[in-house]
Design a protein with these regions (language model features):
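Short, low-complexity disordered leader/linker segments with a strong preference
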Residues: 1-12
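Mature N-terminal segment immediately following signal peptide/propeptide cleavage
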Residues: 12-14, 46
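Extracytoplasmic "Venus flytrap"
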Residues: 14-31, 52-56
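An acidic- and aromatic-residue-enriched active-site/binding cleft used to recognize and process polar
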Residues: 18, 52, 160, 177-178
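Short, polar/charged alpha-helical segment
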Residues: 23-48, 110, 163
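Contiguous mixed-secondary-structure segments that line small-molecule binding/active-site clefts
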Residues: 31-35, 66, 71, 76-177
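A structural preference for short, hydrophobic beta-strand core positions in alpha/beta folds
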Residues: 47-51, 174
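Short, hydrophobic alpha-helical packing/hinge segments within bilobed ligand-binding/sensory domains
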Residues: 58-62, 180
Length: 180
């Protein structure tokens, strides 16, 4: 049998993120993804990581990929709730699924198909590349004993959690994790 014709061309892709390069867990995870892609391709596809603010600001990562400024982004889909209300389902949700449950839903429960449909509307393709676990609640200067205690509180929380805090009378701030 003849050998298949395989292109010997090398590719260089840019990966933008919504966090600092060495941000524990998320930033280091993004670097691991970039390094793994480069290694699995024997260096034919080199992925250079750009931390939030290096190529584009954190909250411009989605549009940077759509506009061709970068080939990929490592981010948290709840940041894109203003683009479509369904994006937070593909990320951590306060009181939501565990990492194992979320992975099972995406890989075996139809989640990836829904995500493909959602991202296809934007000309993008998404896949899981790490996880931070269930979105934490908050750390507050005063004790929270009831739902009424949320009134007047200002906290950093994106996605569905932000909607809940706002409806309870608090003020949610959508801020990249690296800017806290």
């Amino acid at each position: 049998f003849p050998s298949p014709a395989i292109s010997q061309e090398n590719f260089r892709w840019k990966m933008v993120t919504t966090w600092p390069k060495n941000f524990p867990g998320l930033g280091t995870g993004a670097q691991r993804v970039a390094d793994s892609i480069t290694a699995m391709s024997d260096g034919r596809l080199t992925v250079k990581l750009y931390a939030a603010g290096e190529l584009v600001p954190a909250f411009e990562a989605f549009d940077a990929v759509r506009e061709g400024k970068a080939e990929m982004s490592h981010d948290a889909s709840y940041y894109w709730v203003a683009k479509h209300k369904a994006f937070p389902f593909f990320c951590t949700v306060p009181g939501g699924l565990t990492v194992q449950e979320h992975n099972a839903w995406v890989y075996y429960g139809g989640g990836q198909e829904l995500w493909d449909q959602l991202c296809g509307d934007f000309g993008l393709r998404a896949f899981l590349a790490g996880g931070s676990g269930i979105q934490m609640g908050g750390w507050f200067q005063k004790e929270i004993l009831s739902a009424d205690d949320i009134r007047g509180i200002k906290m950093r929380i994106p996605g569905f959690g932000a909607e809940v805090i706002n409806r309870m009378g608090g003020t949610a701030v959508n801020l990249p994790g690296g800017e806290i």
